[in-house]
Swiss-Prot record:
Broad class of where this protein is predominantly found: membrane
UniProt source species: Chromohalobacter salexigens (strain ATCC BAA-138 / DSM 3043 / CIP 106854 / NCIMB 13768 / 1H11)
GO cellular component, one term: plasma membrane
Membrane topology: Multi-pass membrane protein
Lineage: Bacteria, Pseudomonadati, Pseudomonadota, Gammaproteobacteria, Oceanospirillales
Location within or outside the cell: Cell inner membrane
Name of the protein: Putative manganese efflux pump MntP
Length: 196
């Protein structure tokens, strides 16, 4: 995976968390920079760990699926991307995000971590997919974590001003990026077969 694809992947993986942080920021009466940085850091750490877990699972399964790994990567990324687009269009949030938004004064680190975990399940699935590609998983996880920390901090700070509309479109964009990366993975493999 080239650096541009890695950056796109990192920001695509941060869109769920960005949407959740906009909702969180919109619900808070006053958002302080330190609170936004703390929320961003928690989301970033969780989002960085999940692809590592998925990569470990995918690496174990690699010996069983090595002949069709590119197709699996394409299908998984396309399904994840499609789900993100559908969720953005339908404006449906997971229960953890709704719970966080209904308790705006509760800034418990555990509630933030639970919300971060709920929005990072797709990062674990992407980690499984990354095990099927030629990528430095540490670099990918760090990039995903940093992008998420940045996007969540900004989303929390801007939440009151921009509301939930941007969160919806961010999720749709993230889904389109994941589908595009899936197509690129499949194309690279098929182009490699054609030139062999």
């Amino acid at each position: 995976m080239n650096p541009a694809s890695l950056i796109l992947l990192a920001f695509a993986m941060s869109t769920d968390a960005f949407a959740a942080s906009i909702g969180r920021g919109a619900e808070l009466r006053k958002v302080r920079l330190l609170s936004a940085l703390r929320i961003g850091a928690v989301f970033g750490v969780v989002e960085a760990i999940m692809p590592l877990l998925g990569w470990a699972l995918g690496h174990v399964a690699m010996r069983f699926v090595s002949g069709v790994d590119h197709w699996i990567a394409f299908v998984m990324l396309a399904l994840l991307g499609g789900h993100m687009i559908w969720a953005g269009v339908k404006k449906e949030d997971c229960a953890a995000i709704k719970a966080a938004e209904t308790q705006p004064e509760n800034r418990s680190i555990w509630l933030i971590a639970f919300t971060a975990l709920a929005t990072s399940i797709d990062a674990m699935a992407v980690g499984i997919t990354l095990a099927l590609t030629d990528i430095n998983i540490i670099a990918a996880s760090v990039a995903i974590g940093l992008a998420t920390a940045l996007m969540v901090t900004l989303g929390t700070l801007l939440g009151r001003a921009i509301g939930t509309i941007v969160g919806k479109w961010a999720e749709i964009l993230g889904g389109l990026i994941l589908i595009g990366i899936g197509i690129a993975v499949l194309y690279e493999h098929l182009a490699g077969l054609a030139s062999a």
